[in-house]
Amino acid sequence: MGSWLSEVQWLFLVSLFVAALGTVGLYLAQWALAKARPPPRRRAEPDELRRRESDTLLSWILTRDSWGNQWQAAWVTALNYEAEKRGGPLRLSFQKDPRPQSLQLTVEKVSSVVKSTQEKVVICHVVGETLQFLVSAGPASATGSECQLYDVHLSPFHLKVEFHMEEKREDIQIRWSFTHVPETAIKIQPQAPGEKQALGVNMLSEALEDLFKHLVNAASPSVFLSTKPTQVKEAQSLQCPSSTAQEPCPPKPPRAHELKLQVKNIRVSLINHPGASGLSHVCVAQLNDPEQRFISTLVRNTTDLSWEEEFTFELNAKSKELVLQISQDGCSSEGLLGIATIHLDLFRKQPNGPQTFRLISGTEPDSLVLGSVTAEFSYVEPGELKSWPAPPPVSAAKIEKDRTVMPCGTVVTTVTAVKTKPRFDTGRATPLNSESPVRTPVTVKVIEKDISVQAISCHSAPVSKTFSSSDTELLVLNGSDPVAEVAIRQLSESSKLKLKSPRKKSTIIISGISKTSLSQDHNAALMLDYAASMDSTNQGDATSALCHPEATEASATTPPEENEPAQTLPALKPRENDLDSWELEKESPVASWSGPALQEPDGDELSESSLSTSELGAMKKHKGGLLRKGAKLFFRRRHQQKDPGLSQSHNDLVFLQQPEGRQKKGATLGRLLNRKLLTRHRGKHTMNGVPREPCI
């Protein structure tokens, strides 16, 4: 029994030992597996997330182009300061490498240090691929031409960057320093050394490596980063580099259709003399779009041609080319002296200021060069339009000519001149006008109507009075005088036009003899027969009209709106106040109305004429007789007897055929004045309250 218990006890102890060994082995196996297996990822803490955000922000700041330009320039300044401070027999001068280089900076290990409640420092380590410098090395006593230029490369490079931020400051000070690591390689290589100097330069390069390491480690450059809040436009302007070496930021493109291009002071310098003397040259400036053309004044043939005129062009988005043509006497391509083509850049507003261009013989690029053209260009924006000096007031004149050829061969010409009030001419030149805005001449408008043929009866008729649309009293002689009737018709038509602010209106009526004889002019002969037939038809009506001149109304020559019952004309016994008005008016009208436009260009012989007084200003209507101020007067001269062999006028022929008693005395101005003087002594003789002329 005792032996059996001892065996059981031994087996139990052995089992416990084996179990202990198994447990130890299991733990060892789990430990080995845990070592071999990668550690599980832990959930990111909030601090790590903030750190990643700060790394991204700093990386974005350090990759900006403006930052790269500033920190390289600051580093070059710090290296030159340290080199000058160190001194020694070898003088070093660092420069920024103008060649483009990519600065890819990676931010690592960002840490934050709080120095005080108002200042905070953020420290980070930055790694870059390659950094390039230019260094000029030479003896201290050597001149600039004896120094050798070297290229310095650092790859890779490690920097320690510190951001110093203060609460009351809007700028962040950034400092950095070079961190030396074993893998950083410094390479110094001379630029194109000579064969004799190659050995000495290589030895100097090895000495420069140690010196450069010391200077890089000692330099501590710094810049300021602005954190001031700005508007979008200011932020766009800050993106432009401030360095003068960089190309300036192009301005905002202007609105081309609002710009104006001014070209002035054009001067042409020719290599050779133009040739024949006595010729004049002209400059033609032409823009492609919108098409505008300006022509300068003529300049005598000299070696240096110049025009001081100013041309203003309207521009749009398609304005690309301006052509200056120099030609002789404004001729076409045959007299072309040279062409200068100017390309316009409205985005940069070029050309601007005085510019010089080649003057070539043709439009081809390989044309012969004849000289140069210099002109001054300027761009005017809407708010900068130059205010032209106010020119003196000018008056506008309107001259209207109306010619009528009657069947009898008489030419009746009516010339009416109207001068308006002086006005201020703004001088606004159209794009196709070549005159300077300040040199706008007095406006003269000439209207000349075509010559027409009128078949008018030549019998006497009563005289009546009517008013035109321009408040001008017209004396209507219905049939009594064909010349006066044609003139009244012409004046009635012209008086329909309402003029603005008339100052002076003068009318002259001229009737002349046709230079072509009736025997040579077949058309005039036919019209003569037609007029003779009308004379025989209307003879009865004219005879009755002679006995009753006061009862005839206005004829059909009066405008349609004037066909109202006309007033009976007191032609022979005017009132006393009418004569006084005539005496005040008779001196100035004829003498004041003068000018080359009143001369008859045809040069016809004058056999009979009518004259009217001038109307000064806008006159008011007055109730009165014929000879009042502002009234139009038409009167005839006494018909002159001529030899039938010396006259070709049908009126003269008819006059010679008629007896002396049949000639009707016209109501001339002399008769009117004589009758007026007689009435002062004899009194006024009236019939039914209206003076009338007895039948002749």
Curated annotation (Swiss-Prot):
**Ranges for region Disordered:** 551-611
In-chain residues carrying the UniProt-annotated modification Phosphoserine? S54, S436, S581
Where do the C2 domain residues begin and end? Answer: 241-357
List the membrane topology term(s). Answer: Single-pass membrane protein
Query: Can you say where in the cell this protein is located?
Result: Membrane
Keywords of the record, alphabetical order, are: Membrane, Phosphoprotein, Transmembrane, Transmembrane helix
For this record, the Gene Ontology CC terms, alphabetical, are:
membrane
Q: Point out residues bearing the modification Phosphothreonine.
A: T440
Give the stretches traversing the membrane. Answer: 8-28
Which CDD domains does the record cross-reference, listed alphabetically?
SMP_C2CD2 (cd21682)
Is Transmembrane helix tagged as a keyword?
yes
Q: Which domain of life is it from?
A: Eukaryota
Task: List each copy of the SMP-LBD domain by range.
Answer: 45-238
The protein, known as: C2 domain-containing protein 2
**Annotated organism of origin:** Mus musculus
**Quick one: which gene encodes this?**
C2cd2
